[in-house]
Protein backbone atom coordinates (compact mmCIF):
# COMPACT_ATOMS: atom_id res chain seq x y z
CA UNK A 1 0.00 0.00 0.00
CA UNK A 2 1.48 3.32 -1.02
CA UNK A 3 1.87 6.21 1.35
CA UNK A 4 -0.33 8.42 -0.84
CA UNK A 5 -3.48 6.35 -0.43
CA UNK A 6 -4.99 8.67 2.17
CA UNK A 7 -4.28 11.88 0.25
CA UNK A 8 -7.32 13.86 -0.85
CA UNK A 9 -7.98 16.21 -3.70
CA UNK A 10 -8.72 19.91 -3.35
CA UNK A 11 -11.82 21.01 -1.47
CA UNK A 12 -14.61 23.06 -3.02
CA UNK A 13 -17.66 24.92 -1.84
CA UNK A 14 -18.52 24.75 1.84
CA UNK A 15 -15.68 22.32 2.59
CA UNK A 16 -13.16 24.76 1.15
CA UNK A 17 -14.67 27.62 3.16
CA UNK A 18 -14.44 25.66 6.42
CA UNK A 19 -10.88 24.60 5.68
CA UNK A 20 -9.85 28.18 4.92
CA UNK A 21 -11.33 29.40 8.19
CA UNK A 22 -9.44 26.77 10.15
CA UNK A 23 -6.20 27.61 8.41
CA UNK A 24 -6.70 31.31 9.12
CA UNK A 25 -6.60 30.55 12.86
CA UNK A 26 -3.25 28.79 12.59
CA UNK A 27 -0.45 30.78 14.28
CA UNK A 28 3.01 30.46 12.66
CA UNK A 29 4.66 32.03 15.71
CA UNK A 30 3.24 29.35 17.99
CA UNK A 31 4.44 26.74 15.50
CA UNK A 32 8.01 28.04 15.83
CA UNK A 33 7.77 27.92 19.63
CA UNK A 34 6.40 24.37 19.55
CA UNK A 35 9.14 23.31 17.17
CA UNK A 36 11.82 24.61 19.54
CA UNK A 37 10.14 23.03 22.56
CA UNK A 38 9.78 19.58 20.94
CA UNK A 39 13.29 19.56 19.52
CA UNK A 40 14.74 20.65 22.85
CA UNK A 41 13.06 17.79 24.76
CA UNK A 42 13.42 14.97 22.22
CA UNK A 43 16.67 15.92 20.49
CA UNK A 44 15.04 15.12 17.14
CA UNK A 45 14.64 17.52 14.23
CA UNK A 46 11.10 18.22 13.11
CA UNK A 47 12.14 19.58 9.72
CA UNK A 48 10.95 22.57 7.74
CA UNK A 49 7.42 21.18 7.28
CA UNK A 50 5.79 20.90 10.70
CA UNK A 51 2.99 18.61 9.56
CA UNK A 52 5.17 16.18 7.61
CA UNK A 53 7.71 16.01 10.41
CA UNK A 54 5.06 14.91 12.96
CA UNK A 55 2.61 12.89 10.85
CA UNK A 56 4.43 9.56 11.35
CA UNK A 57 4.00 9.89 15.15
CA UNK A 58 7.59 8.89 15.99
CA UNK A 59 8.63 12.30 17.36
CA UNK A 60 5.36 12.71 19.26
CA UNK A 61 5.62 9.29 20.92
CA UNK A 62 9.22 10.08 21.88
CA UNK A 63 8.01 13.37 23.37
CA UNK A 64 5.44 11.59 25.54
CA UNK A 65 8.05 9.14 26.80
CA UNK A 66 10.14 12.15 27.87
CA UNK A 67 7.20 13.74 29.70
CA UNK A 68 5.92 10.49 31.19
CA UNK A 69 8.35 7.57 30.85
CA UNK A 70 6.77 4.36 29.60
CA UNK A 71 3.56 5.99 28.41
CA UNK A 72 4.14 4.69 24.83
CA UNK A 73 5.82 1.28 25.17
CA UNK A 74 6.09 0.58 21.42
CA UNK A 75 6.97 3.04 18.67
CA UNK A 76 6.53 1.82 15.10
CA UNK A 77 9.37 2.86 12.79
CA UNK A 78 7.67 1.58 9.65
CA UNK A 79 6.59 3.98 6.93
CA UNK A 80 3.31 2.17 6.36
CA UNK A 81 0.21 4.26 6.83
CA UNK A 82 -1.46 2.07 9.45
CA UNK A 83 1.74 2.00 11.52
CA UNK A 84 1.91 5.78 11.48
CA UNK A 85 -1.77 6.04 12.41
CA UNK A 86 -1.15 3.59 15.24
CA UNK A 87 1.63 5.82 16.57
CA UNK A 88 -0.70 8.82 16.53
CA UNK A 89 -3.42 6.84 18.33
CA UNK A 90 -0.93 5.74 21.01
CA UNK A 91 0.18 9.36 21.43
CA UNK A 92 -3.42 10.52 21.95
CA UNK A 93 -4.02 7.77 24.52
CA UNK A 94 -0.83 8.79 26.32
CA UNK A 95 -2.06 12.40 26.48
CA UNK A 96 -5.28 11.22 28.13
CA UNK A 97 -3.34 9.26 30.75
CA UNK A 98 -1.13 12.31 31.29
CA UNK A 99 -4.17 14.28 32.45
CA UNK A 100 -5.19 16.20 29.34
CA UNK A 101 -8.75 17.41 29.01
CA UNK A 102 -10.83 15.73 26.28
CA UNK A 103 -11.56 19.10 24.67
CA UNK A 104 -7.82 19.66 24.13
CA UNK A 105 -7.27 16.46 22.14
CA UNK A 106 -7.11 16.07 18.38
CA UNK A 107 -7.91 13.19 16.06
CA UNK A 108 -5.31 11.23 14.14
CA UNK A 109 -6.60 12.41 10.76
CA UNK A 110 -6.32 16.04 11.86
CA UNK A 111 -2.55 15.64 11.66
CA UNK A 112 -2.12 12.75 9.24
CA UNK A 113 -4.29 14.27 6.49
CA UNK A 114 -3.87 17.93 7.52
CA UNK A 115 -7.57 18.00 8.31
CA UNK A 116 -7.33 20.47 11.19
CA UNK A 117 -3.79 21.59 11.99
CA UNK A 118 -5.19 24.36 14.19
CA UNK A 119 -6.58 21.77 16.61
CA UNK A 120 -3.22 19.95 16.56
CA UNK A 121 -1.49 23.18 17.52
CA UNK A 122 -3.99 23.81 20.32
CA UNK A 123 -3.45 20.29 21.68
CA UNK A 124 0.34 20.62 21.71
CA UNK A 125 0.11 24.00 23.46
CA UNK A 126 -2.17 22.48 26.08
CA UNK A 127 0.30 19.60 26.51
CA UNK A 128 3.11 22.10 27.09
CA UNK A 129 0.97 23.90 29.68
CA UNK A 130 0.19 20.62 31.46
CA UNK A 131 3.91 19.77 31.54
CA UNK A 132 4.71 23.20 33.01
CA UNK A 133 2.03 22.68 35.67
CA UNK A 134 3.66 19.39 36.67
CA UNK A 135 7.01 21.13 37.12
CA UNK A 136 8.79 20.43 33.83
CA UNK A 137 11.68 22.81 33.21
CA UNK A 138 12.58 23.60 29.61
CA UNK A 139 14.52 26.25 27.78
CA UNK A 140 11.42 27.46 25.95
CA UNK A 141 8.71 29.25 27.89
CA UNK A 142 5.59 27.98 26.19
CA UNK A 143 2.15 27.05 27.39
CA UNK A 144 0.01 28.40 30.19
CA UNK A 145 0.41 26.98 33.67
CA UNK A 146 -2.83 25.62 35.04
CA UNK A 147 -4.08 27.13 38.27
CA UNK A 148 -4.00 24.98 41.36
CA UNK A 149 -6.86 24.35 43.73
CA UNK A 150 -7.12 26.70 46.68
CA UNK A 151 -9.26 24.79 49.13
CA UNK A 152 -10.42 26.32 52.40
CA UNK A 153 -11.99 24.53 55.34
CA UNK A 154 -14.25 26.50 57.69
CA UNK A 155 -15.77 25.42 60.97
CA UNK A 156 -19.50 25.53 61.69
CA UNK A 157 -19.31 28.86 63.54
CA UNK A 158 -17.67 30.55 60.57
CA UNK A 159 -20.21 29.05 58.17
CA UNK A 160 -23.12 30.33 60.28
CA UNK A 161 -21.56 33.78 60.52
CA UNK A 162 -21.25 33.89 56.75
CA UNK A 163 -24.99 33.47 56.36
CA UNK A 164 -25.49 36.99 57.71
CA UNK A 165 -23.15 38.59 55.18
CA UNK A 166 -24.78 40.25 52.20
CA UNK A 167 -22.81 39.78 49.00
CA UNK A 168 -21.95 42.69 46.76
CA UNK A 169 -24.16 41.22 44.05
CA UNK A 170 -27.22 41.74 46.25
CA UNK A 171 -26.83 45.52 46.32
CA UNK A 172 -27.15 47.66 49.44
CA UNK A 173 -29.96 48.99 51.58
CA UNK A 174 -27.93 51.61 53.43
CA UNK A 175 -29.58 54.50 51.60
CA UNK A 176 -33.11 53.11 51.52
CA UNK A 177 -35.81 54.91 53.50
CA UNK A 178 -39.55 55.39 53.57
CA UNK A 179 -39.52 59.11 54.18
CA UNK A 180 -42.45 60.84 52.57
CA UNK A 181 -44.43 57.66 52.13
CA UNK A 182 -48.02 57.52 53.29
CA UNK A 183 -49.32 54.82 55.58
CA UNK A 184 -50.32 51.55 54.00
CA UNK A 185 -53.94 51.62 52.85
CA UNK A 186 -54.11 55.42 52.61
CA UNK A 187 -55.87 56.83 49.56
CA UNK A 188 -53.48 57.97 46.85
CA UNK A 189 -54.70 60.82 44.64
CA UNK A 190 -53.78 61.47 41.05
CA UNK A 191 -52.96 65.15 41.44
CA UNK A 192 -49.79 67.01 42.39
CA UNK A 193 -50.02 70.46 44.08
CA UNK A 194 -46.49 71.31 42.91
CA UNK A 195 -47.68 71.30 39.33
CA UNK A 196 -50.68 73.54 40.20
CA UNK A 197 -53.15 70.80 39.44
CA UNK A 198 -56.48 71.27 41.16
CA UNK A 199 -57.39 68.73 43.83
CA UNK A 200 -60.16 66.25 43.08
CA UNK A 201 -63.77 67.22 43.56
CA UNK A 202 -64.49 64.33 45.90
CA UNK A 203 -62.71 61.64 47.86
CA UNK A 204 -63.19 58.92 45.29
CA UNK A 205 -59.97 59.61 43.38
CA UNK A 206 -57.48 56.79 43.80
CA UNK A 207 -54.45 55.52 41.98
CA UNK A 208 -55.03 53.59 38.81
CA UNK A 209 -53.10 50.67 40.24
CA UNK A 210 -55.43 50.31 43.24
CA UNK A 211 -58.75 49.73 41.49
CA UNK A 212 -62.04 50.93 42.97
CA UNK A 213 -65.13 49.61 44.73
CA UNK A 214 -66.98 52.94 44.92
CA UNK A 215 -69.77 51.75 42.64
CA UNK A 216 -70.37 48.41 44.34
CA UNK A 217 -73.61 47.95 46.29
CA UNK A 218 -75.96 45.24 47.48
CA UNK A 219 -79.18 46.99 46.57
CA UNK A 220 -81.91 44.50 45.72
CA UNK A 221 -80.10 41.53 47.19
CA UNK A 222 -81.91 39.29 49.64
CA UNK A 223 -80.53 38.40 53.01
CA UNK A 224 -78.22 35.37 53.12
CA UNK A 225 -80.14 32.21 54.00
CA UNK A 226 -83.47 33.36 52.52
CA UNK A 227 -85.68 30.43 51.51
CA UNK A 228 -85.77 29.70 47.81
CA UNK A 229 -88.90 27.84 46.70
CA UNK A 230 -89.29 25.48 43.80
CA UNK A 231 -92.16 26.03 41.43
CA UNK A 232 -93.59 23.48 39.06
CA UNK A 233 -95.73 24.38 36.09
CA UNK A 234 -97.48 21.01 36.38
CA UNK A 235 -98.85 22.00 39.79
CA UNK A 236 -100.36 25.22 38.49
CA UNK A 237 -97.87 27.55 40.15
CA UNK A 238 -96.55 30.51 38.21
CA UNK A 239 -93.53 32.68 38.52
CA UNK A 240 -94.01 35.78 40.62
CA UNK A 241 -91.16 37.63 38.95
CA UNK A 242 -88.06 37.06 36.86
CA UNK A 243 -85.87 36.10 39.83
CA UNK A 244 -85.98 32.39 39.03
CA UNK A 245 -82.77 30.49 39.60
CA UNK A 246 -81.75 27.15 38.16
CA UNK A 247 -81.06 24.08 40.27
CA UNK A 248 -77.36 24.42 39.64
CA UNK A 249 -77.23 27.47 41.89
CA UNK A 250 -77.62 25.41 45.02
CA UNK A 251 -80.32 24.49 47.47
CA UNK A 252 -80.11 25.25 51.19
CA UNK A 253 -83.38 23.87 52.58
CA UNK A 254 -82.21 20.41 53.46
CA UNK A 255 -79.51 17.80 53.23
CA UNK A 256 -81.32 15.67 50.67
CA UNK A 257 -82.90 16.12 47.29
CA UNK A 258 -86.07 14.11 47.80
CA UNK A 259 -88.99 15.35 45.76
CA UNK A 260 -86.89 17.54 43.48
CA UNK A 261 -87.10 17.42 39.72
CA UNK A 262 -83.79 18.35 38.12
CA UNK A 263 -83.82 20.72 35.21
CA UNK A 264 -86.60 22.97 36.52
CA UNK A 265 -86.10 26.55 37.51
CA UNK A 266 -86.02 28.00 41.01
CA UNK A 267 -87.30 31.33 42.13
CA UNK A 268 -86.71 33.40 45.22
CA UNK A 269 -90.03 33.93 46.99
CA UNK A 270 -90.67 37.16 48.83
CA UNK A 271 -94.22 38.17 49.90
CA UNK A 272 -93.35 41.82 49.23
CA UNK A 273 -93.00 41.09 45.52
CA UNK A 274 -95.66 38.34 45.31
CA UNK A 275 -98.81 39.72 46.94
CA UNK A 276 -100.91 36.89 45.49
CA UNK A 277 -98.77 34.21 47.12
CA UNK A 278 -99.22 32.66 50.55
CA UNK A 279 -98.66 34.76 53.63
CA UNK A 280 -95.25 35.01 55.16
CA UNK A 281 -94.21 32.58 57.83
CA UNK A 282 -95.78 33.40 61.17
CA UNK A 283 -98.19 36.05 59.77
CA UNK A 284 -101.88 35.42 60.60
CA UNK A 285 -104.12 34.79 57.68
CA UNK A 286 -106.83 37.36 57.06
CA UNK A 287 -110.48 36.41 57.36
CA UNK A 288 -111.71 34.87 54.21
CA UNK A 289 -108.24 34.29 52.86
CA UNK A 290 -107.99 30.66 53.89
CA UNK A 291 -109.70 27.90 51.96
CA UNK A 292 -113.14 26.87 52.97
CA UNK A 293 -114.15 23.43 54.09
CA UNK A 294 -113.78 20.95 51.32
CA UNK A 295 -111.89 23.44 49.11
CA UNK A 296 -108.34 22.69 47.94
CA UNK A 297 -105.59 24.81 49.29
CA UNK A 298 -104.22 27.57 47.04
CA UNK A 299 -100.67 26.58 47.97
CA UNK A 300 -99.51 23.42 46.29
CA UNK A 301 -98.47 20.49 48.48
CA UNK A 302 -94.85 21.32 47.85
CA UNK A 303 -95.27 24.75 49.38
CA UNK A 304 -96.84 23.15 52.44
CA UNK A 305 -93.83 20.90 52.88
CA UNK A 306 -91.50 23.87 52.46
CA UNK A 307 -93.37 25.81 55.11
CA UNK A 308 -92.85 23.01 57.59
CA UNK A 309 -89.04 23.20 57.41
UniProtKB/Swiss-Prot annotation:
Calponin-homology (CH) domain residues: 28-132
Post-translational modification Phosphoserine, affected residues: 138
SUPFAM superfamilies xrefs: Calponin-homology domain, CH-domain (SSF47576)
Chain positions found as N6-acetyllysine: 8, 25
Single GO BP term: actomyosin structure organization
Keywords attached to this entry: Acetylation, Actin-binding, Calmodulin-binding, Phosphoprotein, Repeat
Post-translational modification N-acetylserine, affected residues: 2
The keyword Phosphoprotein belongs to this UniProt entry's keyword annotation: yes
Gene Ontology molecular functions: actin filament binding; calmodulin binding
Chain intervals with Low complexity compositional bias: 277-288
InterPro entries per record: Calponin-like, Calponin/LIMCH1, Calponin_repeat, CH_dom, CH_dom_sf, SM22_calponin
Repeat region (Calponin-like), residues: 166-191, 206-231, 245-269
Superkingdom of origin: Eukaryota
Region (Disordered): 273-309
Family (UniProt): Belongs to the calponin family.
Function: Thin filament-associated protein that is implicated in the regulation and modulation of smooth muscle contraction. It is capable of binding to actin, calmodulin and tropomyosin. The interaction of calponin with actin inhibits the actomyosin Mg-ATPase activity.
Name of protein: Calponin-2
Amino acid sequence: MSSTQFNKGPSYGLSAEVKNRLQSKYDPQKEAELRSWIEGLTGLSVGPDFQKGLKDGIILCTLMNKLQPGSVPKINRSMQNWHQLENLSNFIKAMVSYGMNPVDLFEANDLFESGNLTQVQVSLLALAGKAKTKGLQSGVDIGVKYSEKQERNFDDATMKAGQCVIGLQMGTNKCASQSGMTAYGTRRHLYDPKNHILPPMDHSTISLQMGTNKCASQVGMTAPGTRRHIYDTKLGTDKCDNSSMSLQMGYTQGANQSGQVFGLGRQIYDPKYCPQGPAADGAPAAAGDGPGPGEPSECPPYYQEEAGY
